[in-house]
Design a protein with these regions (language model features):
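N-terminal Rossmann-like NAD(P)+-binding domain of SDR-like oxidoreductases, especially those catalyzing
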Residues: 1-175
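Hydrophobic "lid"/C-terminal helical patch
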Residues: 16, 225-229, 253-256, 308-315
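Amphipathic terminal alpha-helices
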Residues: 25, 291, 303-318
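Glycine/proline-rich active-site loop of Rossmann-fold NAD(P)-dependent oxidoreductases
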Residues: 125, 152, 168, 177-191, ...
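A short C-terminal helix-loop "cap" of Rossmann-like NAD(P)-dependent dehydrogenase/epimerase domains
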Residues: 131-138, 166, 193-205, 259-273, ...
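C-terminal "lid/loop" region of Rossmann-like NAD(P)-dependent oxidoreductases
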Residues: 208, 236-239, 250-253, 261-284
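Conserved C-terminal active-site "lid" loop/helix of NAD(P)H-dependent oxidoreductases
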Residues: 218, 272-299, 303
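Non-catalytic, hydrophobic alpha-helical segments
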Residues: 221, 225, 241, 252, ...
Length: 318
């Protein structure tokens, strides 16, 4: 099978390419390398082609989609730093780019999975979050929420194209996927903490550290994505994909220090200093993954210690 992976040189996209090739598929990866990296795909030597291009290029996307059997739409402008530093580019990529990809998939009757995000739920205080829960986001003047808004529009476009054109689409809402190749540059907390710990440098926690998350190893997330496109019963459905084991960011920092045998200290950085005045964060973000467990018998296998070990090994060998 020929499979298109948009964002194929990115963190999750490159791991997805590895898994698809391992099962015998030919992967066409499309990436503009704004956040993706050639280092993520340089090890791939067969059944793989890379297209350096932008998902907003309608002619390129149409020509590419015509010749594939399946699409994983992983491309996005993501990460808090990216969103705050380049909000217009983020909004354009996540809305205009996704419209191009989804429309082409509908016109050519291709099966597609879109990678959405737990950011969809915003700051909804109800936890754990299931797929039918409401979005609770801040004011549009707070740029921090623009990524959540853009991904919500992407999901709405996908459902609309299913209704009007029969698009065979499945939506995966990813919760804090972590693992080798994830960059600390875009504000991703685990590689940032691990990198500091390996250097015995202070680990900077934004806020007071009581905010909590649940992390999922990228290998587990990839297994979920492949399972989601392996059956027609997931078409026009949304599935949370995440790990288990809620942990505060302070506890995460302490665990990273312990697992890496680091001499790092912990320092607390006010949100206003890390980002901008008025920045808002979610106090808790915990996925309810009962739907994917019940429907596809999927559950994450790797715990936080394994995640930290794999991230540390990758950083040490890079």
């Amino acid at each position: 099978m020929r499979v298109l992976v948009t964002g194929g040189a990115g963190f999750i996209g490159s791991h997805l390419a590895d898994a698809l090739i391992a099962r015998g598929d030919h992967v066409v990866a499309l990436d503009n390398f704004s956040t993706g990296s050639t280092a993520n795909i340089k090890h791939i030597t067969k059944n793989f082609e890379i297209i350096d291009g932008d998902i907003r290029n309608a002619d390129l996307i149409t020509d590419t989609i015509k010749d594939v059997d399946l699409i994983f739409h992983m491309a996005a402008a993501l990460g808090v730093n990216t969103i705050l530093e380049s909000p217009l580019e983020s909004i354009s990529t996540n809305i205009a780019g996704s419209e191009v990809v989804l429309t082409a998939a509908a016109n050519h009757k291709k099966r597609i999975l879109i990678a959405s995000t737990s950011e969809i739920y915003g700051k909804n205080p109800k936890q754990p979050l299931n797929e039918t829960d409401d979005r609770v986001v801040g004011s549009p003047q707070k740029i921090r929420w623009s990524y959540s808004d853009a991904k919500a529009i992407e999901e709405a476009m996908a459902f609309s194209l299913n209704q009007e054109k029969g698009l065979k689409v499945t939506t995966a809402r990813l919760f804090n996927t972590v693992g080798p190749r994830q960059s600390a540059h875009y504000g991703m907390v685990v590689p940032r903490f691990v990198r500091s710990a390996l250097k015995n440098e202070p680990i900077g926690i934004y806020g007071d550290g009581t905010q909590s998350r649940v992390f999922c190893h990228v290998d587990d997330a990839i297994e979920a994505l492949l399972a989601l496109v392996g059956t027609d019963k997931t078409i026009n459905e949304v599935y949370n994909v995440g790990g288990t084991g809620e942990i505060t960011i302070k506890e995460l920092a302490e665990t990273v220090i312990k697992e890496t045998k680091s001499q790092s200290s912990i320092e607390y950085i006010p949100y206003e200093k890390a980002y901008a005045p008025g920045f808002e964060d979610m106090q808790r973000r915990v996925p309810d993954i009962s739907k994917i467990k019940q429907n596809l018998n999927w559950a994450p296998k790797k715990n936080l210690s394994q995640i930290i070990a794999d991230v540390a090994a990758h950083i040490s060998n890079s």
